């Protein structure tokens, strides 16, 4: 596909600046296409339980059902993978890890952000489309109100 060029003209008809728009190519990315109370859609597949999603890797089940259960061993696998930013979807609500877990994750020396699972799904796509090496650990299922915002 050929790039599109947009030109902004001043009142005199002269070109003031130019911006080249290129079609987005996201074929190689595993993007979160939809999320609802009972599942998340990644590509053509649906996931109804918590999962880990990392660059160049198929999603795998994550054995965490709620944030209050989370501990250091739950991050062992994902910390061995290659990524720059990890988004941890904490379920229906935004939670922060306890001090012990914060210290362990800080030693990993990479960006780790905690947010609601709904926010993590949306943020994952934005970062992936921006070319960032992003991973996500998403706790499911969500209540219907967490998805709709009501």
Summary of predicted features, one role per range:
Residues 117-122:
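Short acidic loop-to-helix transition motifs that present clustered carboxylates
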Residues 60-62, 94-97, 123:
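Short active-site-adjacent helix-start/loop capping segments
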Residues 123-129:
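Conserved phosphate-binding catalytic cores of ATP/NTP-utilizing and phosphoryl-transfer enzymes
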Residues 2-73, 81, 129-150:
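Non-catalytic interface/targeting segments
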Residues 78-115:
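Mid-chain, well-packed structural core segment of small domains
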């Amino acid at each position: 596909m050929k790039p599109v060029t947009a030109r902004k003209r001043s009142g005199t008809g002269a070109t003031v600046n130019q911006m080249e728009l290129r079609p987005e190519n996201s074929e190689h990315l595993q993007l979160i296409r939809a999320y609802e109370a009972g599942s998340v859609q990644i590509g053509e597949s649906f996931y109804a339980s918590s999962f880990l999603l990392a660059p160049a890797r198929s999603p795998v089940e994550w054995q965490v059902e709620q944030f209050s259960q989370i501990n250091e061993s739950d991050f062992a696998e994902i910390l061995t993978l290659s990524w720059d930013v990890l988004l941890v979807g904490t379920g229906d609500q935004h939670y922060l890890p306890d001090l012990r877990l914060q210290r362990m994750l800080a030693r990993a020396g990479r960006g780790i952000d905690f947010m609601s699972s709904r926010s993590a799904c949306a943020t994952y796509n934005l970062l992936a489309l921006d070319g960032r090496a992003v991973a996500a650990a998403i706790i499911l299922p969500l209540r219907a109100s967490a998805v709709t915002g009501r």
